[in-house]
């Protein structure tokens, strides 16, 4: 049994986070081709009996496209207006595509405040449990339309790790526009080497994770490493992989060397 098979076997609860750069064209308009491939893979996993939670960015990006804005809004009210419009566009798209496979989705919008007290945490957990028990695929996003800066998660990488911990997931997959974690920035160093497995999120690993997010997103590699820290500390395996690859999710669960695997603690 190889390392991947050891840590990626028997996945019953899976959280998949998809970033804005994977879901949208550079213009901000939704990339239906990519979304369809992601939906198909999730629908197939659902049919295998795996309980999948999708953490989806893209609300602001979809709003930018719908409102025909030339660039990402800079002020908080403008961002929130774009998110309010875009979240509806995003959910309508998911609802329509999953319905083609006979599957139902439910929306959960979370803020950091929702996880600030035990009572509210239990309430969120109960909502997830009820949806999953009814065979519904929860689609999660931060409530960008109303949340204030002081209580923002700020990126869905961190949010997805918190959700994975909350529902006691076996695996967290972060789909981005990069193949995984490199030993140096591949945009600067053409000889950068993709790291297959990370046994511990230490200072050396954090140093490899410099760099900003994409134009339409908020999370760079540093936020993904923070997500890995949260996930692995809670006994959850995590993989960073490229959402551009059509079968990335399937490849990961087939133990192929897709992306970078982060080994969980105490498992």
UniProtKB/Swiss-Prot annotation:
GO CC term (a single one): cytosol
Protein name in UniProt: Glutamate 5-kinase
Transmembrane segments: none
Gene: proB
Lineage, broadest ranks: Bacteria, Bacillati, Bacillota, Clostridia, Eubacteriales
One example GO MF annotation: ATP binding
Annotated ATP binding sites: 17, 176-177, 218-224
Domain of life where this protein originates: Bacteria
Purpose of the protein: Catalyzes the transfer of a phosphate group to glutamate to form L-glutamate 5-phosphate.
Family, per entry: Belongs to the glutamate 5-kinase family.
Pathway per the UniProt entry: Amino-acid biosynthesis; L-proline biosynthesis; L-glutamate 5-semialdehyde from L-glutamate: step 1/2
Chemical reaction(s) catalysed: L-glutamate + ATP = L-glutamyl 5-phosphate + ADP
Compartments (UniProt record): Cytoplasm
Annotated EC: 2.7.2.11
Keywords: Amino-acid biosynthesis, ATP-binding, Cytoplasm, Kinase, Nucleotide-binding, Proline biosynthesis, Transferase
One of the GO BP terms on file: L-proline biosynthetic process
Annotated substrate binding sites: 57, 144, 156
HAMAP family tied to this protein: ProB
């Amino acid at each position: 049994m190889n390392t991947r098979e050891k840590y990626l076997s028997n996945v019953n609860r899976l959280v998949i986070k998809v970033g804005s750069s994977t879901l949208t064209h550079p213009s901000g308009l939704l990339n239906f081709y990519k979304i369809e491939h992601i939906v198909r893979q999730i629908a197939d996993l659902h049919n295998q009996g795996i309980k999948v939670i999708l953490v989806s960015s893209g609300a602001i990006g979809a709003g930018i496209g719908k409102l025909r804005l030339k660039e990402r809004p800079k002020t908080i009210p403008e961002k929130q207006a774009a998110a309010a419009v875009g979240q509806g566009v995003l959910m309508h798209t998911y609802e329509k595509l999953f319905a083609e496979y006979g599957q139902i989705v439910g929306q959960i919008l979370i803020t950091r405040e929702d996880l600030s007290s035990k009572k509210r945490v239990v309430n969120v957990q109960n909502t997830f449990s009820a949806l999953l028990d009814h065979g519904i695929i929860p689609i999660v996003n931060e409530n960008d339309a109303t949340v204030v800066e002081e209580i923002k998660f700020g990126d869905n990488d961190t949010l997805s790790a918190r959700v994975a911990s909350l529902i006691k997931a076996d695996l967290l997959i972060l789909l981005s526009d990069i193949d995984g974690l490199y030993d140096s920035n591949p945009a600067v160093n053409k000889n950068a080497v993709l790291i297959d497995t990370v046994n511990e999120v230490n200072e050396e690993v954090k140093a490899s994770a410099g760099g900003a997010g994409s134009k339409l997103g908020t999370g760079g590699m540093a936020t993904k490493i923070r997500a890995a820290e949260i996930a692995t500390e809670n006994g959850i395996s995590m993989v960073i992989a490229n959402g551009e690859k059509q079968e990335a999710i399937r490849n990961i669960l087939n133990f192929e060397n897709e992306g970078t695997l982060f080994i969980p603690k105490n498992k």
